[in-house]
Amino acid sequence: KQCSDFQSKWRMITYFHGEHTGVCHGIALSMCYGNQGYIDFDDITSGAHDYWTLGSPYENSKMKDMILYYQMTQCLDSGRSTYGISKNSGWGNGDLETFLKKFVAEAQYAKRVKKPFVFSFMIPEGGHSGVACGYKKDTDGNHEITIYDENSYHPGSYGGYLTMKVSSDFKSFHF
């Protein structure tokens, strides 16, 4: 069976880093780039006009290559986070309030210009990426950010929307 260069590279990454950890980042990033017009869906699947009409990556090698390509970009210096925070050392490399202010500001901007963005997190067992695609302020002044989880972090789960609620004082958040 023939394989693409991207599939070969992905197998190498899997070999060097242990078991395959998924492609959520590649899916989320390709969804955002597609939404912003950087990907011509018709080049991937003839007649496709949006992400949902591309079909299954299991049956479409061009779509699978696209997802794997964007998945691998997180390994590049240019593909790293624009900002982040770590809870490991008491929110270590930045305080939670500053992080949440930046995150809410980015969600507000994304809503205004209609350009969703990738939201990623890491936990000791791995990490996950989704698409931050909505924002509103509730009646108490708290911030609600809608995140599309394209395949969910938990095994056997399906895609869906969840809401990240950030307190009005930016000192806490919950889902």
Where are these regions (language model features)?
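Context-gated lysine
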Residues: 1, 9, 62-64, 87, ...
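Histidine (H) residue identity feature
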Residues: 17-20, 25, 49, 128, ...
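Cys-His-centered catalytic/binding microenvironment captured across papain-like cysteine peptidases
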Residues: 124-126, 136-175
